[in-house]
From Swiss-Prot:
Its EC number is 5.4.2.10. The active site is at S105. Belongs to the phosphohexose mutase family. One of its GO terms (biological process) is carbohydrate metabolic process. The modification Phosphoserine is found at S105. The gene is glmM. Catalyzes the conversion of glucosamine-6-phosphate to glucosamine-1-phosphate. It comes from Chromohalobacter salexigens (strain ATCC BAA-138 / DSM 3043 / CIP 106854 / NCIMB 13768 / 1H11). This is Phosphoglucosamine mutase. Activated by phosphorylation. Pfam families: PGM_PMM_I, PGM_PMM_II, PGM_PMM_III, PGM_PMM_IV.
Amino acid sequence: MTRRYFGTDGIRGTVGEAPITADFVLKLGWAMGRVLSRRTGRKSRAKVLIGKDTRISGYMFESALEAGLSAAGVDVSLLGPMPTPGIAYLTRTFRADAGIVISASHNPFQDNGIKFFSAEGVKLADAVEEEIEAELDLPLSTVAPDALGKALRIQDAAGRYIEFCKSTVPDRLTLEGLKVVLDCAHGATYHIAPSVLRELGAEVSLIGAEPDGLNINHGVGSTHPAALRAAVIERGADLGVALDGDGDRVVLVDAEGREVDGDDILYLIARDRRARDLLGGGVVGTLMSNFGLAAALEALDIPFERAKVGDRYVMERLAANGWQLGGESSGHIVCGHVQTTGDGIVSALQVLAIMVREGASLAALLQGFEKAPQALVNVRLTPETDKEALLGNEQVQHTVASVEAELGEEGRVLLRPSGTEPLIRVMVEGRPHFDVDALARRIADDIEGHMVR
């Protein structure tokens, strides 16, 4: 079935432009409610949790979803600002039938999106998303007045998730003596992550923790680590932690200001859990994962598999293999022994716990782990440009082939249309003697030259 609305991570776009409009989101809530009621098959009303990040449009879409779900006879519990992984966790612990996230993750405030979790706290199966899309074709109708859904606001949601995050490290472990700069991207973790780290004993200073509805991800967060690098050096911190707007990604910075990405974090957690005989299988990365990660895991005799880009595909491969650990270079890390989805706070805590156990700095822990030089260029497309047609352009394919020939067996090229933004991502990876930045730029320039304007 061809999808009209759902991408790799729910439905996302620019606020006020179809489909990210109040009327569509109201009907989306209604369609979700209809599907849930049918699937649960209970006489009692289905129950859904709704959480959001800090975008100003979140108020509008929260109300729209609440109205649509109520019209379908579904009860709603409102969490307010809450990280995406917190919504997944609370959906499970409240025994809700589904969780809904209002967020566009690392995108700017002008964008927003809707994504769903099942009762188990994992992304919805494709079949369920297709059912929701089918319901959207039907005229909206309201259940009988005595069957309408109710809504309530959960007052202690943040505190519950804070305690969960702390529970993912050993009870007696303390972060006392660690000086941490925390960047919350002016997003959904601003009132949660500082409390988690401080209650575990860390000395925490903040950037990106003053959301105003318009500044989410603006020059801060995991996709803009320069601000964190500068703050770590200026404040003499042991490390920095950068989360994204909805808290499902994390990037770290060591005491010297060097960025520690998702591949580094996966390596550290995998090595630590293997050493303690806790790994439970292998590691799932993605097509974007650095060759150095695969080589380092192989040297440790840890199986490694690549999934398509997107945390839902990482989760699918983890489930298929019966493994627990996976993630993306961007900082989506799934620690399946404690969480059902990517969780930036929890992933950071796993690394902090390793630092405490080993009595070592972040830089020391990564000593000897070498990644292949990798360049990533994002080409933003014009509205008139078709992604697939552009990737199939004969001249673009010729340029890609020439770069691949130049790299030979010592590198690779990956072109990937974003599932959440109007972008084509150009990745070139190669041995140190290649100028991967120049090679990636060559391909990106050719793509830009063939866009429809």
